[in-house]
Swiss-Prot record:
Family: Belongs to the NAD(P)-dependent epimerase/dehydratase family.
Annotated protein name in UniProt: Uncharacterized protein YtbQ
InterPro entries: Epimerase_deHydtase, Lipid_A_modif_metabolic_enz, NAD(P)-bd_dom_sf
Pfam families: Epimerase (PF01370)
Length: 253
C-alpha cells in the first residue's frame, strides 16, 4: 500500500481526501494543528524547512500539497502578502526540496482555477470556448499569481531533480455541496464534487506521467475549464456533476 502524506490536511479538501483515500493508501496528515481523523497526524510548520525535513517520513511515496491560509484580496496589504508568500511560495519550495532530498518520487500540488481567472466570470469562460492549460496564465489576484509561482517551482524540481509533479487547478470544493449550489450560481459550473475530487487525486497519484498541469472540475454543464487532458492523460473519470446532484435532490434520492 502506497504511503501518502497530505500537507495541510486540516482544510476542507484535506479532510475529504484523508477520509476518502485511507481505504487505498496509508495516509498521514501533516499540519500545524493536530489532525483528529483516522489518518496518522504529524504537527509541523511547512514554512520551517528543518522541521519539515525531520518530520516527513522518508518512506513516503507521494506528497499532496494542500497548504492553505485564509486570505484577503488586497494587493496593497503588505502583511497579507507576506502571509501568503510563506504558504504559497516558501512552503511550496520547501516541500519540493524536502521531497527531492528525501528521495520521495511524487508531489501533487493543489493549484487553483484562479491562475487563469481573468478569462472567467461567474463560472463562464470569456474566451468563447473552454479555458485550457495552454492559455497564458493571467490572474486577477495575488492568490492566483502565487499559485502559478508554486506550479513553476514544481517544474524546476522536475527538470533539475526528476521529481514528478502534477498540478491540479481545482475548481470549487465545499463541505456542503447542496447548500452552496443553491446559494451560489457560479458553483453549478465550477464544482469539483467529492467523488470527483477523490477520482482526480487518485489518478494524479497513480499516473506514470512525470509532469503535467490539469484542471480539476466535475463534468458540469457549461463548465469554464477543459478536462480533456485530465481525462485522456491522467485517466480522470468524472463520477457525478452538478446537474446530477440537483436531480438527485429533486427526486429525493
Amino acid at each position: 500500500m502506497k504511503k501518502v502524506l497530505i500537507a495541510g490536511g486540516n482544510g476542507v479538501i484535506g479532510r475529504l481526501l484523508a477520509e476518502g483515500l485511507i481505504s487505498d493508501y496509508e495516509v498521514t496528515v501533516l499540519d500545524k494543528d493536530h489532525f483528529d481523523g483516522k489518518a496518522s497526524s504529524i504537527q509541523a510548520d511547512a514554512a520551517n524547512y528543518e522541521e519539515l525535513l525531520k518530520k516527513i517520513p522518508k518512506d513516503t511515496d507521494a506528497i499532496l500539497n494542500l497548504l492553505a491560509v485564509k486570505i484577503k484580496y488586497d494587493i496593497m496589504d503588505i502583511a497579507e502578502f507576506e502571509k501568503m508568500t510563506d504558504v504559497f511560495y516558501r512552503a511550496s519550495y520547501y516541500l519540493c526540496r524536502a521531497a527531492a532530498e528525501l528521495g520521495i518520487q511524487k508531489l501533487v500540488f493543489a493549484s487553483s482555477n484562479h491562475v487563469t481567472d481573468v478569462y472567467e466570470k461567474d463560472g463562464r469562460s470569456l474566451l468563447g470556448r473552454e479555458i485550457t492549460t495552454s492559455d497564458y496564465p493571467l490572474s486577477k489576484n495575488l492568490y492566483g499569481v502565487l499559485k502559478l509561482t508554486s506550479e513553476q517551482i514544481g517544474h524546476l524540481f522536475y527538470l533539475e531533480n526528476k521529481l514528478s509533479v502534477i498540478n491540479l487547478r481545482i475548481g470549487t470544493v465545499v463541505t456542503d455541496e447542496m447548500d452552496t449550489l443553491h446559494e451560489k450560481e457560479r458553483t453549478k459550473k465550477t464544482l469539483l464534487s467529492h467523488p470527483d475530487l477523490l477520482s482526480i487525486f487518485k489518478a494524479a497519484i497513480e499516473t506514470n506521467i512525470r509532469y503535467g498541469t490539469y484542471y480539476a472540475v466535475s463534468d458540469n454543464p457549461g463548465r469554464p475549464w477543459s478536462i480533456e487532458s485530465a481525462v485522456n492523460e491522467l485517466g480522470f473519470s468524472p463520477q457525478i456533476n452538478t446537474a446530477e446532484l440537483l436531480n438527485e435532490e429533486e427526486n429525493g434520492a
